[in-house]
Design a protein with these regions (language model features):
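N-terminal presequence-like segments and the immediate start of the first folded domain
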Residues: 11-87, 93-146
């Protein structure tokens, strides 16, 4: 499964998010972009959860980390949230030696005074991938039942 396929399907799922007239995000689990093994996005009780990997697996670690942070921005925008709404980010690096690059880009990206809970571990990722992030964020009020 390519990162491009994932992004395309995630975008389609997020478009559906805005088209649903009966929004029950507070009481029902909402799954978007479902496959047999996973959903691209899940929203429950005002919290969205999803995973990001770089669209371009040919980029180096710096390029992939920058891509993933940018992709998080895009998903947050689509669910009407912001980086200040991030609750938790779990980061998997193929090589912990890249953590200095991660920290440099992360410190520029995270809004001052609003860091989410964060963990960073080394993991054996799919070939060509340097980083994978699991994100949770509060969903904007207008995307929830009142």
């Amino acid at each position: 499964m390519s990162a491009l396929w994932f992004r395309k399907n995630l975008f389609e799922a997020l478009v559906l998010l805005h088209e649903i007239s009966n929004r029950k995000f507070m009481s029902e689990i909402q799954r978007f972009g479902e496959s047999a093994r996973w959903s691209d996005l899940v929203i429950y009780r005002g919290e969205a959860r999803w995973v990001e990997v770089a669209d371009d697996a040919t980029a180096d670690a710096r390029g992939q980390i920058a891509q993933v942070l940018s992709q998080i921005n895009g998903t947050l925008e689509r669910i009407q949230s912001r980086r200040t709404d991030l609750l938790q980010v779990l980061i998997f690096l193929a090589d912990l030696n890249d953590s200095s690059i991660l920290n440099e880009l992360w410190d520029e990206w995270v809004p001052a005074g609003h860091p989410p809970v964060r963990a960073c571990v080394e993991a054996r990722l799919s070939p060509g991938y340097y980083v994978e992030m699991v994100i949770s964020a509060a969903v904007a009020d207008e995307c929830q039942d009142k």
